[in-house]
């Protein structure tokens, strides 16, 4: 078991984990694709960076400021409501594991009247100059996700609904500017003390599969024993475990292979690795393209 100082250091590293992204402008009217290089936080959201990206690209096409944009990876629209690190692990990690691509991530920025609303949440708000307000849409979605996780953890959404206007604003600003100290000060008002959790909000993704396991997890069994990460995987992904109790794939959280902690209490894994919406996102790569 790590000391409190070690846990603080790990959480700080997870909070500040980053990804190098290369964004190409998807405009058929431009012969040579323009690119924008940026380092983004894993525990953040793409719309936070859209204003900077748009400011750079609008010198090539002014329309981009007034049309909602989306990102694509290998022609597939990216769901911006998920944390960037989760998207990276879900869509790109398998290519790295197979040594087919390097760790940087190349995406294409698209904009048109034909927004892929069947795959991506649309941006519906605008500013007074008719430019797209990405911040307002993102805030609405993230706060809703925090309400969902709060309900799972507490059995109701009262802790987040009862936040003062000042605390609500500070919580959002801490996410927007990526301030861990401010975030923790408000988030602790949402999460019950002394680990008195009703359930734990957990989502499990399998790259290449449309299946999403959205599993509110009881941290303790009926007999009072702590539920392990292994127990969760065996229950929801029985094909992951072999007959001799070995894993047939790799388990990633925040881009880290966590097989060494598979026998840890799920409540401790959640507490350490939860994302800023208080969900624990687990990515499972089956052995067809995973290495341990």
From Swiss-Prot:
The gene is ATG5. It is a peripheral membrane protein. GO terms for cellular component: Atg12-Atg5-Atg16 complex; autophagosome; mitochondria-associated endoplasmic reticulum membrane contact site; phagophore; phagophore assembly site membrane. GO terms for biological process: autophagy of mitochondrion; cellular response to nitrogen starvation; piecemeal microautophagy of the nucleus; protein transport. Conjugated to ATG12; which is essential for autophagy. Its main location: membrane. InterPro entries: Atg5, ATG5_HBR, Atg5_HR, ATG5_UblA, Atg5_UblA_dom_sf, ATG5_UblB. This is Autophagy protein 5. Involved in cytoplasm to vacuole transport (Cvt) and autophagic vesicle formation. Autophagy is essential for maintenance of amino acid levels and protein synthesis under nitrogen starvation. Required for selective autophagic degradation of the nucleus (nucleophagy). Also required for mitophagy, which eliminates defective or superfluous mitochondria in order to fulfill cellular energy requirements and prevent excess ROS production. It holds the Pfam family ATG5_UblA. Belongs to the ATG5 family. It is found in: Preautophagosomal structure membrane. It comes from the Eukaryota. Keywords: Autophagy, Isopeptide bond, Membrane, Protein transport, Transport, Ubl conjugation. Conjugated with ATG12. It comes from Debaryomyces hansenii (strain ATCC 36239 / CBS 767 / BCRC 21394 / JCM 1990 / NBRC 0083 / IGC 2968). There is a cross-link at residue 147 (Glycyl lysine isopeptide (Lys-Gly) (interchain with G-Cter in ATG12)). GO terms for molecular function: Atg8-family ligase activity.
